[in-house]
Amino acid sequence: MGFASLLPLPAGADPLDDAFAQLAEPSGEGWRIAESDILRDWSRSGSAAMDLLLQRGEAALDRGDLPTAIGHLSALTDHAPDFAAGFQARAAALAMSGQFGPALSDLQRTLVLEPRHFAALTQLGAMLEEMGDPDRALDAYRASLAIHPHQQEAIDAVARLERQRLGTDI
């Protein structure tokens, strides 16, 4: 640990700024560590109880138990309304259950709380694409890639939508 990490941050500085700068680097492998650091930070609410609700909601989502996932994640967003990860996770569960309106609202809230939430932007792109809005989906994917240019899902989606736009989709 260097001495710089022991110094207080200037007022208004985000401790993730360095990680986001590393994430945006076009070459090298440092972005993988930065991505991991960012995702780990985003998954911490500051409350063990809220973190447990997130874990339970995500586990239910992984099992495909959407009602349970939505229940846990709704409890989380009710009790931790400033925790972006709760809204982003609930948006995934809502979208998987076909509730696109509420899912879009949750993604909007996620992005208000954390404008650099590249996962939410990629999720938004996928949802807009599924809803038949390829132009806005492309905008969301591109916004996500401006923050995190190494996301294969977003890279592939941009290429696919650009091919479709040009009429060369195969």
What are the roles of these predicted feature ranges?
Residues 41, 75-76, 109-110, 143-144:
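Canonical positions in the second alpha-helix
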